[in-house]
Curated annotation (Swiss-Prot):
Organism: Caldanaerobacter subterraneus subsp. tengcongensis (strain DSM 15242 / JCM 11007 / NBRC 100824 / MB4) (Thermoanaerobacter tengcongensis)
HAMAP family: CinA_B (MF_00226_B)
Family: Belongs to the CinA family.
Disulphide bond pairs: none
Cleaved signal peptide residues: none
Highest taxon listed in the record's lineage: Bacteria
Full protein name: Putative competence-damage inducible protein
Length: 412
């Protein structure tokens, strides 16, 4: 089944509200095997909404609208759909009573315009709204299905789950599933080049996407529930054979979660000493439940004096090489490891910008130190972007060094 979503509301076009409804609906409809080919945002304007409905009617079997079901004059979705389909609006006594009951529960009286929400195009299946005053409805006409939902997510989601999802499930026996592989250490163009033959497939499909400092490959398959996972697994296996060590996580997993799991599995502990990342490493680690079992200490030593007094970085090192140097990164990692009595020590020092750079040490220069029981590694990074981007990428590189070590892989 081909479907599309029309989101109604001038506030969406002005950027005052983020359209989370379209994301939620697309994800849920994919589980039903319904292909959503188009998302449209349109303001509270009858003529423009009619144009959108006309286009959708010609190309889609399922048309879902969100928003525009309120009691005010600019809430015109129902009226516009009724006019577009040449259907009269009919009052529902049941919906009207529900509106009265809703206001009684909150100790108020409905105004006359509230009862506008009890009007529906003739032939509609009315969807009760337990969380507001705007019922939705489903309408089938000439082989097309219209699903009309309120805009607030707190009303839309329960209505969809309780009424719309079971209703649409009757029309399909397929599902659409996806798996996302997260890749670090390779750029998008390189990833695409390495897996290019797999990008040509139609089912499953493989699509590269750029994240904040990493690349993802989304594998999507459509078919019977029992078939799609096998289809995805076969393609994933081929991708892992090509990219192997660069794949660090699947779906919603984050780099820090993987690091914590590996530390727990190996029985290792970690301590961090940060300068340019300003506590970002420690923050990300402690966001993960159970981190206290493997994370001993996190310190932010921003000044040279703090590096010297707290971490014991030698004054001669700072004088000779400066705070942003491989020598300082090395001592920071080694010394925090000893200070915390941890198995591993991780450090960052660099210039995140926008100021502070020089021709010899430009903005984006970062050194990551990683001390292990066997040896200490120092990685030089030349990063681009704004301050947050440089800090985030420094964090990912640091955690990736830990991941590689714990997985027994080569540390670049």
């Amino acid at each position: 089944m081909r479907g599309e979503i029309i989101s109604v509301g001038t506030e969406l076009l002005l950027g005052q509200i983020v359209n989370t409804n379209a994301k939620y609906l697309s994800e849920r409809l994919a589980l039903l095997g319904i292909d959503i080919y188009f998302h449209t945002n349109v303001g509270d304007n009858e003529e423009r909404l009619k144009q959108c409905l006309k286009i959708a009617y010609e190309r889609s079997e399922l048309i879902i609208t969100t928003g525009g079901l309120g009691p005010t004059v600019d809430d015109i979705t129902k009226e516009t759909i009724a006019s577009f389909l040449n259907l009269p609006l009919v009052e529902s006594e049941e919906a009207k009573q529900e509106i009265i009951n809703f206001f009684e529960r909150i100790g108020q009286k409905p105004t006359e315009n509230n009862f506008k929400q009890a009007l529906f195009p003739a032939g509609s299946k009315i969807l009760p709204n337990k969380n507001g005053t705007a019922p939705g409805f489903i309408l089938e006409k000439e082989g097309k299905i219209f699903v009309v939902l309120p805009g607030p997510p707190s009303e839309l989601i329960p209505m969809f789950e309780e009424h719309v999802y079971p209703y649409l499930k009757r029309f399909t026996s397929e599902t659409i599933k996806s798996r996302v592989l997260k890749i670090f250490g390779l750029g998008e163009s390189k990833v695409e080049e390495m897996v290019r033959p797999l990008l040509q497939g139609s089912n499953p499909t493989v699509a590269p996407l750029v994240g904040d400092g990493y690349v993802t490959l989304r594998i999507t398959a459509k078919g019977k529930e029992e078939e799609v996972y096998e289809m995805i697994s076969q393609v994933e296996k081929k991708i892992r054979e090509i990219l192997g060590e660069y794949i660090y996580a699947v779906d919603d997993e984050e780099m820090e979660e993987i690091v914590i799991k590996l530390l727990q599995k190996r029985g290792f502990t970690l301590a961090t000493a940060e300068s340019c990342t300003g506590g970002l490493l420690a923050k990300k680690i402690t966001d993960v439940p159970g981190a206290s079992k493997v994370f001993n200490l996190g310190v932010v030593t921003y000044s040279n004096e703090a590096k010297e007094k707290v971490l014991g970085v030698k004054k001669s090192t700072l004088d000779a090489h400066g705070a942003v140097s491989p020598e300082t990164a090395k001592e920071m990692a080694e010394n925090v490891r000893v200070l915390a009595k941890s198995d591993l020590g991780l450090s960052t020092t660099g210039i995140a910008g926008p100021s502070g750079g020089s021709p010899e040490k430009p903005v984006g220069l970062v050194y990551v130190g990683f001390a292990t029981p066997e040896k200490t590694y120092v990685k030089k990074l030349m990063l681009s972007g704004n301050r947050d981007r440089i800090r985030t990428r420094s964090m990912l590189h640091a955690f990736d060094m830990v991941r590689r070590y714990l997985e027994g892989r080569q540390i670049d």
